């Protein structure tokens, strides 16, 4: 198969998963410390959970990718910021914004 967009077979696969899962809230974060006002902070965040396959790619896979890319670019040693920037990824947004509330 030379078509990179074609699936290896025509069968549809489904993931059996609950839309809501009980358990602890989790988050991942890193902080770029500001040069002149380190105690003042911007938050750049997104949630890691999603519902469905295609929908989750945008809600919020695209946001997660953006936060990670911003963290990568702004972490370069030659990039300085006046204020600190915290890059945060949390879960349980799809169950009522619980991850962000817990943060």
Where are these regions (language model features)?
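Soluble metallo-hydrolase cores and metallopeptidase-like ectodomains found primarily
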Residues: 1-56, 69-72, 76
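Acidic/histidine-rich catalytic neighborhood of metal-dependent amide-processing enzymes
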Residues: 24, 50-103
